[in-house]
Regions:
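Short, basic (Lys/Arg/His-rich) helix/loop patches that form interaction surfaces
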Residues: 34-38, 109-111, 125-167
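Basic, Lys/Arg- and aromatic-enriched nucleic-acid-binding interface segment
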Residues: 23-55
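Short alpha-helical segment immediately N-terminal to, or the first helix within
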Residues: 47-48, 154-155, 168, 180
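C-terminal secondary-structure termini that scaffold catalytic or DNA-interacting sites
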Residues: 1-13, 17-20, 196-208
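A short, glycine-centered helix-capping/turn motif at helix boundaries
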Residues: 47-60, 158-160, 171
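Catalytic-site neighborhood detector that most strongly recognizes the C-terminal catalytic loop/helix
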Residues: 77-81, 169, 173-194
């Protein structure tokens, strides 16, 4: 694997900075999004956090992409695979579906084809602005890509099978998805906690 590929398949930069938002930062980001006056920006931030989709994939979503009955959103993978069009369905909580339906008037004849009309760079800046208002410090994690990585880690921590996370994120190779195991390490923390366990009183020498 080349150096660039290794860096792309890591949750840290060569300088040791993490590329993903933490669970606390994710919750603060969503809370800041809920306070936005611009409701369409709120739903945009929400869809990024709850699907882990790429920002360009979110901008391609239409009213037909949202399936309220099944509570899923159908996302077209923008990374081509042999010229085939790949659509992946990602489940959403019912309250997110309701929010999308209400804000974008999905049941109305006046519903625009595209859910959002931002440019990619404009959407990137808007998301960064919401992160700043959420008190998330600048860095490689405070980006739309950081939200994508944060989704993967949140899914791993929630016990979602790796193959399902691969499907939801649109990874062609499972090896790409396994990077999220780097940030969990539940078993490692368990072993470490045993090392950190303080000695009992009958072992500690008082020196008297």
């Amino acid at each position: 694997m080349s150096r660039n590929n290794h860096q792309n398949h890591s949750l840290y930069t060569p300088q040791g900075q993490r590329k993903y938002i933490s669970q606390d930062e994710r919750q603060r980001f969503l809370a800041a999004a809920r306070q936005l006056v611009r409701q369409e920006l709120m739903t945009f931030c929400t869809i990024l956090a709850y699907t882990g989709c790429r920002i360009s994939e979110a901008l391609e979503l239409t009213s037909a992409s949202v399936q309220p009955t099944n509570a899923v959103v159908a996302i077209r993978c923008l990374k081509k695979r042999g010229g085939r069009t790949i659509i992946r369905e990602v489940p959403l909580p019912q309250y997110v579906i309701t929010s999308l339906t209400d804000v974008h008037k999905l049941h109305s004849a006046d519903c625009p084809p595209r859910l959002w009309h931002y440019s990619r760079s404009g959407a990137w800046r808007l998301v960064k602005r919401v992160m700043k208002s959420a008190g998330i410090r600048p860095g490689p994690h405070a980006t739309p890509k950081g939200l994508r990585h944060g989704f993967g880690i949140h899914a791993i921590c929630s016990g979602v099978p790796l193959t399902l996370i691969q499907k939801w994120l649109g990874h062609s190779k499972l090896s790409t998805t396994t990077i999220y195991l780097q940030a969990v390490g539940t078993e490692e923390r368990l072993f470490a906690s045993r090392m950190w366990k303080p000695p009992t009183n009958d072992v500690i020498s008082t020196g008297t």
